[in-house]
Every structure is written in structure tokens, then in C-alpha cells.
């Protein structure tokens, strides 16, 4: 039997999603939970996205194949949640086809980067980047239009054999002292979203313009600013799955 579920986690204490020897990861904790209730059998977790160290998620999608005794999805989900640590949980389990792979099934991924644009606030800045100087959000949002569409994003991510990606939308909004950068695309290069945020922050500070973004897209061998925004402000909020019919998986609550 193969199951899929939404996963939510606080990335603060993790070295990323993907298993890494000797380091605490989201995949590692999920596989440990399955191993503990599956009699010690190694059960591999597959994820829709490989978030970096410190990055959070409220809409990650995972899947695994359960070969243990026949058990209702609701009961198995409850057992998994009971042994997971406090900083990660899964939503209701859904039966999927044996060949279902979240990474291949994902047709859209949505991230949000949160900025606290005000006086120092230890509580707010646990999940948001603190920026003291007032940002020009209008300039940031206007410039972000240049990034929408299908481009070579080499300048905004690590080296990749296929750097062509499609962004469906990039929006920058302000609500009081909270500024959010929402980025939606088909897939992302490593640190691509945080590099985009760093570039938009330069524009918000008046240090760069929309023309600079356009130049970076035309010259993919040049890393834009060579900087990435810190991970703690970033959250993978939603993964849209394709298929015929599209796969539908509920939120990470249970």
C-alpha cells in the first residue's frame, strides 16, 4: 500500500528535508517514526521538495510504501503522529497509486518569505527576517514582474544541469510592518527563492533596479549580488499535484 500526506514542520532544528548522515533532517525523523511502528523495517520517504536547512513548510507532500500489516489509513496516521517530535507533523494519509512520486507529480510549488520591517522583535523574527529601514515595497513588487515567465535562473541559484525554470508569479505585499514575498513556480534551483528575495531587498533599499534583475536573467553566468536571504523567513506553503484526475491531499493537520 502506498500513502501520501501533507507535512508541516518548523525547520529551525533541521539540517534540511533530505536525509544527511549524522545530521537531523525532516526525512530522517519521518523514516524513524515509520521504522518504530513498522517493526524496525526501513521505509523510505519521498518528498515533493528538498527544503534547505532552517526552511519551514506547511504544505510539503510526502509519500511512502507501507508493507506491514494491513491497517486503516486513519489509524496509521495517528500512530505516526504519536511518535513524531514536536517540530514536525503529518496530515491525514491518502491511498495513492504504487507509482506515485511527489516530486514528479508536483506541477506547482508556492513559497512565502516573511520580513518584519520594523523595530527589533525577537518573537516575530523567529520566522521572519528583521529589516529596520523601511522598504520600498512598491518598487520591489513592480520589479518582480521581470522574473515571471520561463527563464534561465542560473544567476539566482546553484549550478544545475537544467537551470530553466518557470515562475508563475512573484508578489511583494505589505500589511503593517509585515512584508511578504510570494513566489510560485514549477520547480526551483537550490536557494533560488532566497536569492530572489535578496535581490528584491536590494531594490527595496534603493540599491538596485528592475533593470538589474533583467540584466541578471540575460547574463546567467553572473550570480546576482552573490547573496541569499536567511532561511528562517522562508516557508514552503503549498504543492499542487497533477495527474488525471489531479491528486488531492489535505492539509497537514490531524
Q: Where do the protein language model's features map onto the residues?
A:
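Structured-RNA-binding interfaces characteristic of tRNA pseudouridine synthases
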Residues: 1-254
Amino acid at each position: 500500500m502506498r500513502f501520501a500526506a501533507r507535512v508541516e514542520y518548523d525547520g529551525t532544528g533541521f539540517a534540511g528535508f533530505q536525509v544527511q548522515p549524522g545530521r537531523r533532517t525532516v526525512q530522517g525523523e519521518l523514516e524513524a517514526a515509520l521504522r518504530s511502528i513498522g517493526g524496525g523495517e526501513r521505509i523510505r520517504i519521498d518528498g515533493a521538495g528538498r527544503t534547505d536547512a532552517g526552511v519551514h513548510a506547511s504544505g510539503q507532500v510526502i509519500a511512502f510504501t507501507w508493507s506491514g500489516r494491513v491497517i486503516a489509513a486513519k489509524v496509521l496516521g495517528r500512530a505516526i503522529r504519536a511518535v513524531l517530535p514536536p517540530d514536525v507533523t503529518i496530515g491525514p494519509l491518502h491511498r495513492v497509486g504504487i507509482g506515485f512520486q511527489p516530486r514528479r507529480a508536483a506541477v506547482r510549488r508556492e513559497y512565502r518569505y516573511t520580513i518584519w520591517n520594523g523595530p527589533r522583535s525577537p518573537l516575530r523574527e523567529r520566522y521572519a527576517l528583521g529589516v529596520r529601514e523601511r522598504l520600498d515595497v512598491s518598487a520591489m513588487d513592480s520589479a518582480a514582474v521581470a522574473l515571471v515567465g520561463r527563464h534561465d535562473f542560473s544567476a539566482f541559484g546553484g549550478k544545475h544541469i537544467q537551470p530553466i525554470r518557470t515562475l508563475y508569479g512573484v508578489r511583494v505585499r505589505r500589511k503593517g510592518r509585515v512584508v511578504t514575498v510570494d513566489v510560485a513556480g514549477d520547480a526551483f534551483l537550490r536557494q533560488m527563492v532566497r536569492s530572489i528575495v535578496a535581490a528584491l531587498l536590494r531594490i527595496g533599499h534603493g540599491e538596485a533596479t528592475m533593470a538589474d534583475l533583467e540584466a541578471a536573467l540575460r547574463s546567467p553566468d553572473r550570480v546576482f549580488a552573490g547573496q541569499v536571504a536567511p532561511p528562517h523567513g522562508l516557508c514552503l506553503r503549498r504543492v499542487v499535484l497533477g495527474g488525471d484526475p489531479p491528486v488531492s491531499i489535505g492539509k497537514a493537520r490531524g
